[in-house]
Amino acid sequence: MLILAIDTSTAATSVAVLGATAGPILRTQIDGRRHAEVVAPLLREALREADVDPADIGLVACGVGPGPFTGLRVGIATAIAFGFARDVPVVGVCSLDVTARAAVRDLGTSVTVLSRARKSEVCWASYDDRAMRIAGPIIRREPVNITGACVGDAGPVDEVRYPSALDLAELVVERMA
């Protein structure tokens, strides 16, 4: 099944196509103020490079945050509109779960993902070394109960990471299995 994935929950706008014969395709642009301007061109580029007709997409996956409202609204609206137009299911996934999955895979350890929330607040969640959530998501001024490496885009992190639409699509496939 061809999956289109979209995440705009952070400063990154990320679009991916998974399941195409051309292989997995990922397009990402980091600019937290231009989600609305870049999501459609990235979507078009990803579909074109994957050599996929939009009518062939069988599922749309969308990162649902937590994150800034404007960015979330752009990604969720784009995913729902695409799904509605193509009459295919749309599934939402916590963007912290997506970031954690990739970080645990790459670092081989438990992680805490920190993401910008409202004003001076941070949203965080902790994950074990299998990327299973063990705490959170919680919004606070400062994270507590930090487990393992800290990754994300807010606060004191060991590594800045944004959710990847390709990791989002792969996580949806894992959860459907």
Name each region found by the language model.
Residues 1-64:
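N-terminal beta-alpha supersecondary unit
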Residues 12, 68, 119-121:
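Glycine-rich nucleotide phosphate-binding loop and flanking beta-alpha elements
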Residues 22, 28-34, 88-175:
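Surface "functional belts" at beta-alpha junctions
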Residues 27, 42, 50, 72-76, ...:
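Bulky hydrophobic/aromatic packing residues
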Residues 38-41, 77, 81, 98, ...:
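Short amphipathic alpha-helical face segments that pack within enzyme cores
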Residues 48-51, 84, 104-105:
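Residue-level signal for alpha-helix termini/capping positions
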Residues 59-92:
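DPxDG-like acidic metal-binding loop motif
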